[in-house]
Every structure is written in C-alpha cells, then in structure tokens.
C-alpha cells in the first residue's frame, strides 16, 4: 500500500487545479472530505475523487 490515505490541503488544491485559499474554503465545508489532525487540516485522498464525482453529478442534475 504505497498510496497515502490523506493529502495536504495545498496538494488537494494542486490536484483540483484551484488556489490554496479556495481549497481551504472547501475544507471548511461539511460535504468536503477534510478533517483535522491536531491543528493540521488533511484531506481524505479517496474521498476527494468521490467528492469531485458527486459535484459533477450534482451539476448535471441542476442543469437538466
């Protein structure tokens, strides 16, 4: 198991192609797969992909 379970918020920003401040704003949302370990915010790596898919599905439903 070489894949990390969690990634940093800046890494999530890089993967999503958004700014770090935007990623930190997402991390404060209840539906985003981020949580605190001590004072550090981390993102559940597998959950990030699922979150992106759910956002894409939601956009399709809204525009239909």
Roles of regions detected by a PLM:
Residues 24, 33, 49:
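Nucleotide phosphate-binding site architecture
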Residues 35-41:
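Short Lys/Arg-enriched helix C-cap and helix-to-coil transition segments
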Residues 3-5, 9, 37, 58, ...:
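N-terminal targeting/docking segments
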Residues 28-29, 53:
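Residue-level detection of the helix-turn-helix DNA-binding "recognition helix"
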Residues 1-26:
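Polyanion-binding surface elements
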Residues 47-64:
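A short, Lys/Arg-enriched interface patch at domain edges and termini
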């Amino acid at each position: 198991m070489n894949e990390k379970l969690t990634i940093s918020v800046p890494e999530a920003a890089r993967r999503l192609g958004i700014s770090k401040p935007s990623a930190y704003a997402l991390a404060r949302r209840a539906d985003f797969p981020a949580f605190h370990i001590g004072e550090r915010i981390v993102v559940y790596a597998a959950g990030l992909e699922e979150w992106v898919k759910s956002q894409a599905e939601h956009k399709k439903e809204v525009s239909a």
